[in-house]
Amino acid sequence: MAAGTVRGLAVAGGGESSESEDDGWEIGYLDRSAQKLKGPLLPEEKNETFKKALTTGDISLVQELLDSGLSVDSSFRYGWTPLMYAASVSNVELVRVLLDRGANASFDKDKQTILITACSARGSEEQILKCVELLLSRNADPNVACRRLMTPIMYAARDGHPQVVALLVAHGAEVNAQDENGYTALTWAARQGHKNVVLKLLELGANKMLQTKDGKTPSEIAKRNKHLEIFNFLSLTLNPLEGKLQQLTKEETICKLLTTDSDKEKDHIFSSYTAFGDLEIFLHGLGLEHMTDLLKERDITLRHLLTMRKDEFTKNGITNRDQQKILAALKELEVEEIKFGELPEVAKLEISGDEFLNFLLKLNKQCGHLITAVQNIISELPVNSHKIVLEWSSPQNFTSVCEELVSNVEDLSEEVCKLKDLIQKLQNERENDPTHIPLMEEVSTWNSRILKRTAVTVCGFGFLLFICKLTFQRK
C-alpha cells in the first residue's frame, strides 16, 4: 500500500453497499511503523491483530501472522477475506503476498468476486491495473457477474479505466456482455462520459448498436447525459477504430496495450479520433478510406467532392465503383427536387388549375423539408465550441452562407406574397365579371337533369307502344 496518512473505505465493489458501513474493519489513520508479535495470541486476538495489520498495510506483520498458522482465507465479519479487502484498497503488495500464500483469487461473497472488487476499487488506475493483473494471473474469471449481472469490465468502464478494460478483454472478458438493465461496458462508459474508454472498447470490438432494456443505444445514453462528444462519435455510420485490436492474440494485445506507457501514446488515444475531419469521416462511412490520401493530395474538400460531375471524378482518378458509392450516398441525402421546367408556362395561361395547385403543394412541401432540416441541425450542434469533434473550416464561411440563405428566404417570402396577391386579384375580378362562364360542375348538373327527363319520357312512350302492339296481336 502506498505511503500515506489516510486510507479509503473498504466497501463492496460496484456500489453494492455491504451490510455494515465498515464491514467489520477499523477505519482510521495508518500507522506505517512495523509491528511484531510480543507472544502467543488467542485465536480471537489473532483475528483482530490480522485485521489491524491489513488495515495499516503492515506486510511484515501479515506474513508473521500467516506463519503462525492463521488461514490466508480467514473469514472476517460479513464474510470478507483478507484478499478481498486488499483488492478493495488497491494494495498491490498485500495482494501479491496473500496470493503467494495461497489465497483464493476466485472467492466471492454473495456473487461479489474479488476481481469485481478490484475493478471498482478507489485508487489510481496504475494500482488497480496491477491488482487486476495479479488476480487474472491466478485464474480469476473475468466473466463472472455480480447480482446485477455486471461483470468486471463493466465496472472498469464505468469508473474510467481503459487499460484495465483492455487487460480484461485480453484475458477473455466478453466485451458485449449486458447487465440486468441491458447495459454493456460501452453503455456504462458512454453514460459516465469516459471518452478514452469508449474508444478503447470500440477498438476491442464493442457493438455500439446494442440497446438497453428501454431501447436506448450507447450514443443515446451519452446524449441523455449531455456527453455530446461521445454522442457525435458513436452516431457515425462507421467508426474507423472499430475492431482494430480484435484479431490480435492475447499476448500481442497485452504487449500493445500495456507496454506503451509514454505521454505521447496516452495523448494519441483520443487524437486518433479528433484528427478525422468531415471528409475522412464521410469516406470511412462509405468504406472508401483508401481515397483519403488521393483526395488530400489534390486538395479536394468534402464540399467539392459532393458537387463533382462525372468527368471530374474520372479526371481525379476516382474509379467507377467508388463513384457509384458516392453518387448513391448523395442520392440518399438529396431532398426531392421540384422539376419546375416540366410545368407549363404560367405566362401562356395554358396551365390547368390542378397543375397549378400541384405546383404550389410541392413548393410548400419542399419548404417544410428545409425547415425540418435546419431545425435538426440546430438541435444537434453543440452549444460550446470545445465540444465540436470534427475539424471545421473558418466559421466565417458558414456565417456568410447563412447570410445568403436569409437573403434568399426573404426574397422567396416577397415573391410568394406577390403571387398570393395576384391570385386574390384574379379571383375577385372573376366573381365580379358579368360574362363569367359557370364552372363545369354547374353546367353538367343542369344537363344531367334534362337528360334524365328525356330518358323517362322516351321509356314511357316505348312502354305505351309495346302495350298497344300486344293488344292488337291478341285481337
From Swiss-Prot:
The ANK repeat ranges on this chain: 45-74, 78-107, 110-144, 148-177, 181-210, 214-243
Keyword Repeat in record: yes
Subcellular location(s) of the protein: Cytoplasm
Chief site of localization: cytoplasm
PTM annotation (Phosphoserine): residues: 17-18, 20
SMART domains (UniProt xref): ANK (SM00248)
Transmembrane segments: none
One Pfam family this sequence matches: Ank_2
Keywords assigned by UniProt, alphabetized: ANK repeat, Cytoplasm, Developmental protein, Differentiation, Meiosis, Phosphoprotein, Repeat, RNA-mediated gene silencing, Spermatogenesis
Start and end residues of each SAM domain: 272-334
Alphabetical GO biological process terms: cell differentiation; male meiotic nuclear division; regulatory ncRNA-mediated gene silencing; spermatogenesis; transposable element silencing
UniProt-annotated stretches for the region Disordered: 1-24
Entry GO terms, CC: pi-body
Subunit structure and binding partners: Interacts with DDX4, PIWIL1, RANBP9 and TDRD1.
Annotated function: Plays a central role during spermatogenesis by repressing transposable elements and preventing their mobilization, which is essential for the germline integrity. Acts via the piRNA metabolic process, which mediates the repression of transposable elements during meiosis by forming complexes composed of piRNAs and Piwi proteins and governs the methylation and subsequent repression of transposons. Its association with pi-bodies suggests a participation in the primary piRNAs metabolic process.
Name of this chain's protein: Ankyrin repeat, SAM and basic leucine zipper domain-containing protein 1
Gene responsible for this protein: ASZ1
